Amino acid sequence: MKKRNLMVALLCSMCLAVSSPVPAMADGTKVVTLGADLTQDQKNTMMNYFKADSSQVQVITVTNQDERDLLGNYVPSEQIGTRTLSCAYVKPTQSGGIKVRTANLNYVTCNMIATALSTAGVNNCEVVAACPYEVSGTGALTG
């Protein structure tokens, strides 16, 4: 199982590195990705959970089509599902490597997210990937 997760993480990160549909984060820019299928109340809950102010972060909406475009060849369709709900908060740092923590994700792991960021050239950041309730986390990985 660990070998399979590592393989999925590597494949996802390669896919993300070459075909990301969302703007790349500039050095020092904090980014929040929100699942397109969250209600406004759920989006507000996630922004509060991340302690992020929408006027001070770049907010990107991730759709189920984004997930399918980026992960469809590597992640089982039943893990991607039909709605995008998970979110991520990325805060660039000056040192310390890539630190990831998750909440309510049952498929995507911290290692998958860290590998995708590393492959995309990110060296130092803090990431929180989460959802208001348990989901696979492919939306957060896509973001």
Q: What label would you give each PLM region?
A:
Residues 1-2:
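N-terminal secretory signal peptides that target proteins for export/translocation
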Residues 5-15:
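Sec-dependent N-terminal signal peptides
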Residues 26-126:
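N-terminal, leucine/charged-rich tether regions that mediate assembly and partner docking
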Residues 118-142:
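Amphipathic, coiled-coil-like alpha-helical scaffolding segments used for oligomerization/assembly
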